[in-house]
């Protein structure tokens, strides 16, 4: 970073501050992770200089012989990782990947069935404030109040009533295994496409620890960060019959030039994800989430769906008399990063909320195992139950710092 320091000391100083925040804080945001040095180095390479509109062997610019090899390798690796017929690695984000599928398979005004945002879905699954909800006629399913699991009877009922062109499965705050076979069954009953957004669980799927949606879905989208631990970006996987439509939708339909430095970084992360070490890492992610959920249950917290089968959990704070916004802010003060999150039937608005979403991918990358996770659960409880006790918060902050110093990230 010496060149950044010399050229732009202001930006360098903020990068240093962000490094310090990551190094000295406990990261529990479920959608965040720590990329390897190799992933970051590929993203910071000379490939950032190259324009490459089009696809390997079919570019609109010369000089693409090497970036063609990079993109071909990224495609080959991600297809192997998920046993997919076809992959498009050009989406700049998960949202871009989702919009690419919609553009390929739908027309404006088409009816789509997706998971409600306040029941664990995502903005791009038809929220009225998102382009998906403005361009398409979305209807939403949710979870059962007693179990917190997807209400498949309601999914089937809505599908038969509205005859959607597409059903979207996948979530951003759902802690249980998703039954893709039942989604496929319902989609077939009404003649709908099935799209699965596996952004949150892609790493678990790659490791064989969550059912793979690829055999069931017509289209699968994912981010490449989160549990995959790559750079920020997206991917679309699809059956061979949809290859042409997907590629045409991503370029020239939705995007211009691909980010070749990011695609190189994706390729590196896919190589990492094919390793046995990555599978062991994902096993620990799930163990840590299970331990954290159990510890919080034992401390008297209400968890949506009662616990976790994957990398995340949703904590309902209503019985604790604390809003998600307040808990997030005070936890941030002691260097524990979480995100406030709506819970089902939340009486609070989206900027306040009654819950927290917690995840274990980042702390597991750091090296935390069961003992450290138990300590984290105790810290969460001490902060949430002692929000106004400044002495308590200072002690918690020191405990967080000491714990993080035992597990350094990028600088030994």
Curated annotation (Swiss-Prot):
Reaction(s) this enzyme catalyzes, per UniProt: (6R)-5,10-methylene-5,6,7,8-tetrahydrofolate + glycine + H2O = (6S)-5,6,7,8-tetrahydrofolate + L-serine
Modified residue annotations for N6-(pyridoxal phosphate)lysine: 226
Primary location recorded for the protein, binned into one broad class: cytoplasm
GO biological process: glycine biosynthetic process from serine; tetrahydrofolate interconversion
Pathway membership: One-carbon metabolism; tetrahydrofolate interconversion; Amino-acid biosynthesis; glycine biosynthesis; glycine from L-serine: step 1/1
Record flagged with keyword Amino-acid biosynthesis: yes
EC number(s) from the headed UniProt entry: 2.1.2.1
Keywords: Amino-acid biosynthesis, Cytoplasm, One-carbon metabolism, Pyridoxal phosphate, Transferase
InterPro entries: PyrdxlP-dep_Trfase, PyrdxlP-dep_Trfase_major, PyrdxlP-dep_Trfase_small, Ser_HO-MeTrfase, Ser_HO-MeTrfase-like, Ser_HO-MeTrfase_PLP_BS, SHMT-like_dom
PANTHER family reported for this sequence: SERINE HYDROXYMETHYLTRANSFERASE, SERINE HYDROXYMETHYLTRANSFERASE 1
Name under which the protein is recorded: Serine hydroxymethyltransferase
Organism: Natranaerobius thermophilus (strain ATCC BAA-1301 / DSM 18059 / JW/NM-WN-LF)
Lineage: Bacteria, Bacillati, Bacillota, Clostridia, Natranaerobiales
